[in-house]
Amino acid sequence: MKQLLEFIPLILFFTVYKLYGVQQAAITLVIATVIQLIVLKVLYKKIEKSQWIMGIFAVFFGILTAYFNDLNFLKWKVTIINGLFAAVLLVSQFVFKKPIIQMLLGKELKLPTNVWNRLNLGWAGFFIICMLLNIVISYYFSDDVWATFKTFGFTGLSLIAAIATGVYLYPHLKNVENTNEQA
């Protein structure tokens, strides 16, 4: 249910954009994002930092988009968010010497350091690719193509990245289970 809630503002934005245009879609995005954050707080008592960041960016850039009737602000948001996530992942690994993914999931998953490092770098690479794809699609394709790719392309890429992560982790999780069973 939580994942579904995260997609509602995006789907509403896309639908309203196709039917009524940029300004109404941006206003819809802002309202839907605020409602989404309230519902997440009420249902789950906690809003993750990444959800706060995404929500604040969506509201801020959504307001700019609606005010100036210019989709470029939301296009910048996607680039900035992906760049920010990639930077956080890389800084955590190379500056602080502990991948943020390990900090977030280390209690649930017991994995060797090299696996955490590869996983962290893989997701950093994913966000860099998404950032670059967004720049290319923003500047070389129509707004309609961008809106469609933003809604369905990035969602599909995220799903592929999540599946690839599961496939990569599976052998390591089996090794961890075998180690636990022998103990």
UniProtKB/Swiss-Prot annotation:
It comes from Actinobacillus pleuropneumoniae serotype 5b (strain L20). The keyword Protein biosynthesis does not apply. The chain crosses the membrane at residues 19-39, 53-73, 76-96, 121-141, 151-171. GO terms for cellular component: plasma membrane. It is a multi-pass membrane protein. Belongs to the YciB family. This is Inner membrane-spanning protein YciB. Plays a role in cell envelope biogenesis, maintenance of cell envelope integrity and membrane homeostasis. Keywords: Cell inner membrane, Cell membrane, Membrane, Transmembrane, Transmembrane helix. It is found in: Cell inner membrane. The keyword Cell inner membrane applies. Its main location: membrane.
